Amino acid sequence: MPLSWLLPFSAMELLLTATIFYLVLWVVKAFRLQVPKGLKSPPGPWGWPLIGHVLTLGKNPHLALTRLSARYGDVLQIRIGSTPVVVLSGLDTIRQALVRQSDDFKGRPDLYSSTFISDGQSMIFNPDSGPVWAARRRLAQSALQSFSVASDPASVSSCYLEEHVSREAEHLVTKLLDLMAGPGCFEPSSQIVGSVANVIGAMCFGKNFPQTSEEMLQIVNTSKEFTEFASSGNPVDFFPILRYLPNPMLQQFKDFNKRFLQFLQKTVQEHYQDFDKNHVQDIASALFKHSEESPHVNGDLIPRKKIVNLVNDIFGAGFDTVTTAISWSLLYLVTKPEIQKKIHKELDAVIGRDRKPRLADRPQLPYMEAFILEVFRYSSFLPFTIPHCTTRDTILNGFYIPKDRCVFINQWQVNHDPKQWEDPFEFRPERFLLANNTAVDKTLSDKILLFGLGKRRCIGETLGRWEVFLFLAILLQQLEFSVPPGVKVDLTPVYGLTMKPPHCQHVQARPRFSK
């Protein structure tokens, strides 16, 4: 009797059956969660086996998750691959998690992409959230704030930040007018990024920063390779097999981080050769001094080899966020000329044309400030914070969230929530002005969520806000921006860690008055 007669299944059928069995076992294991009695897991839609909700997220996860939050509430759960992800929406819920329960939500998930950022030692992206991380964060924040508000005795500017921005903004005005005399138009982002990088570079390295370096310009002009890949929900972070398949974007991301780190390592090393602890005038020097006075890692201390990692975080965040904010601002201004006229009128009335705007003018320019706030809210160019992670089992809004659960914070939803904003999809700076139009409504402005909250809140938020204000004030005092008649400006954002505006090659600038 043939052996095959004794077996009810063929080898192929047995293999298929075994595969299905293990697939079902894997899915059941992936979805299984031990929830304490009396508690419940966050709700959410049923996802596909193996891939979860990847297809649901699509190209614009912030929009997809906003739609899901309207159905499932401010605390919902999805899966990317087999990884469960909790998504938080709603300002009150996010404040509860990141501020009132900050110790529970201060972690970072151990994502594959983060291992390439500053050799895996980034203070911003690294999953470490212990005492050493907290001490280094305090140190970086202190150095950043010190050298943004400190002043050079030889300068007429109120602080180093004002001095650097004023100089770079004037250079940018000249550059834009030169482009108008030549090509006759320009693309804003590519012109702005170098000027903004020079500001944060000068803050970090003082006179040692190579402002005209081709290497530096090439790096900052390709920063989109970083922001597009480091976005929340990147499949490479959740599907390990994708790391071994041909992936041009992953390779570009690796190359960018390698070049950026090498550039900063070289700049830090060169700067250290000229370091004088009795003459500290920039962030790197302050970190050098701290390292030499406290060479052993203990509490607030930092070894010198880690300085480049802190500078990497400060420099990287410093130029990308500000560049994106100014780029969006200019595109909104050319599409809404009536708003630009109001800003010009306010600048002329408060500052005139005989002096430059200064940081001290900010309270006297409420419409300008309201415009910037509306740019932040409407564009929400940081749609999510960098993903958080729970550091222990916790309960939020009655839902059980276990330790080490990846958490997305949907800032875009908060900034377009009809419960918080009247006509959220209308660009209207006036919403932020008090009834007499002489001041900004701080209660309303505090509802904008762009820089995160709690123990992971962006350390450069204040610096970034000041920088955006001063750049725009100087540019708009001297220039009027427009596009040629008939040119339509695309305002559809390109999703990423920071959402960039589409390239618009047709922006024009003309001087408002003769110097």
UniProtKB/Swiss-Prot annotation:
Pathway: Cofactor metabolism; retinol metabolism; Steroid metabolism; cholesterol metabolism; Lipid metabolism; arachidonate metabolism. The keyword Transmembrane helix does not apply. GO terms for biological process: arachidonate metabolic process; cholesterol metabolic process; estrogen metabolic process; hormone biosynthetic process; progesterone metabolic process; retinol metabolic process. Its EC number is 1.14.14.1, 4.2.1.152. GO terms for cellular component: endoplasmic reticulum membrane. It is found in: Endoplasmic reticulum membrane; Microsome membrane. Heme binds at C458. It catalyses: an organic molecule + reduced [NADPH--hemoprotein reductase] + O2 = an alcohol + oxidized [NADPH--hemoprotein reductase] + H2O + H(+); 17beta-estradiol + reduced [NADPH--hemoprotein reductase] + O2 = 2-hydroxy-17beta-estradiol + oxidized [NADPH--hemoprotein reductase] + H2O + H(+); 17beta-estradiol + reduced [NADPH--hemoprotein reductase] + O2 = 4-hydroxy-17beta-estradiol + oxidized [NADPH--hemoprotein reductase] + H2O + H(+); estrone + reduced [NADPH--hemoprotein reductase] + O2 = 2-hydroxyestrone + oxidized [NADPH--hemoprotein reductase] + H2O + H(+). Keywords: Endoplasmic reticulum, Fatty acid metabolism, Glycoprotein, Heme, Iron, Lipid metabolism, Lyase, Membrane, Metal-binding, Microsome, Monooxygenase, Oxidoreductase, Steroid metabolism, Sterol metabolism. Its cofactor is heme. It is a peripheral membrane protein. Its main location: endoplasmic reticulum. Belongs to the cytochrome P450 family. Interacts with PGRMC1; the interaction requires PGRMC1 homodimerization. This is Cytochrome P450 1A2. It comes from Cavia porcellus.
